[in-house]
Amino acid sequence: MANTSQARKRARQAGVRRVRNAGQRSMMRTYVKKIVKAIVSGDKSQAAAAYKEAVPILDRLARKGLVHPNKAARHKSRLNAQIRAMS
């Protein structure tokens, strides 16, 4: 339990940030799933469009520290390779 006013405030801020960050990470996962779904369905143009939409989101979350930059780069690289491999 927070004893000082500063600790109480930090606990409040941490709670707000935790909820916001969870929403942002969920959004990222939704974008990635949308790309994977398009890849599985075989629609290259839809997959490419979804990828183009998701890249700025991944970059922003990596820049803000919500996901590790290497994780964002790994997602982008693997998804792009799968899209390129489609005939």
From Swiss-Prot:
<feature type="compositionally biased region" description="Basic residues">
    <location>
        <begin position="7"/>
        <end position="20"/>
    </location>
</feature>
<protein>
    <recommendedName>
        <fullName>Small ribosomal subunit protein bS20</fullName>
    </recommendedName>
</protein>
<comment type="function">
    <text>Binds directly to 16S ribosomal RNA.</text>
</comment>
<keyword id="KW-0699">rRNA-binding</keyword>
<keyword id="KW-0687">Ribonucleoprotein</keyword>
<keyword id="KW-0689">Ribosomal protein</keyword>
<dbReference type="InterPro" id="IPR036510">
    <property type="entry name" value="Ribosomal_bS20_sf"/>
</dbReference>
<keyword id="KW-0694">RNA-binding</keyword>
<dbReference type="GO" id="GO:0003735">
    <property type="term" value="F:structural constituent of ribosome"/>
</dbReference>
<dbReference type="Pfam" id="PF01649">
    <property type="entry name" value="Ribosomal_S20p"/>
</dbReference>
<dbReference type="GO" id="GO:0015935">
    <property type="term" value="C:small ribosomal subunit"/>
</dbReference>
<dbReference type="GO" id="GO:0006412">
    <property type="term" value="P:translation"/>
</dbReference>
<comment type="similarity">
    <text>Belongs to the bacterial ribosomal protein bS20 family.</text>
</comment>
<feature type="region of interest" description="Disordered">
    <location>
        <begin position="1"/>
        <end position="22"/>
    </location>
</feature>
<dbReference type="GO" id="GO:0070181">
    <property type="term" value="F:small ribosomal subunit rRNA binding"/>
</dbReference>
<dbReference type="GO" id="GO:0005829">
    <property type="term" value="C:cytosol"/>
</dbReference>
<dbReference type="InterPro" id="IPR002583">
    <property type="entry name" value="Ribosomal_bS20"/>
</dbReference>
